[in-house]
A protein has these predicted regions:
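N-terminal interaction/assembly modules
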Residues: 1-111, 115-118, 122-132
Length: 132
């Protein structure tokens, strides 16, 4: 079995989805416009699958997140909120063990989020997983 290339690995794809969701939320652009800027990702099946899955379930994911946080979802850090959305999509798919999903979420939060953001992401995901 061949290893995924660096540009199409699941880890890299998650990072690119996070970047795309960030651009969508802060830039106010439409998904098609942002995808034009990420033309190199168009052939990346995993990237497209996650992005589509998160986009199609955004309202439901936000409702779930809101149930487990102590402030309005609009006040959450954009990066951490989108990491939670990606994680909820992967939990919904049930293809990966929840510990892998949490580890990936923590990795992204440490890399892209606020200094203590990974603790918040970990705590919220832990509550969601324990409740399900």
């Amino acid at each position: 079995m061949t290893k995924p290339t660096k540009t199409t690995s699941p880890t890299r794809s998650r990072d690119k989805v996070l970047q795309t969701l960030y651009e969508l939320e802060l830039g106010g652009e439409q998904l098609n416009e942002v995808l034009k800027n990420h033309s190199s990702e168009k052939s990346n099946k995993f990237y497209k699958e996650i992005l589509k899955g998160v986009s199609e379930n955004l309202e439901g994911f936000d409702e779930t997140i809101q149930d487990y946080v102590d402030r309005p979802i609009q006040q959450l850090d954009v990066i951490e909120k989108n990491i939670l959305r990606i994680s909820l999509y992967e939990l919904k798919k049930k293809e990966l063990d929840s510990s892998i999903i949490i580890n990936e979420a923590i990795r992204m939060a440490k890399k892209y989020g606020s200094i203590e953001g990974y603790k918040f992401v970990n705590a919220v995901l832990d509550k969601i997983i324990k409740a399900s």
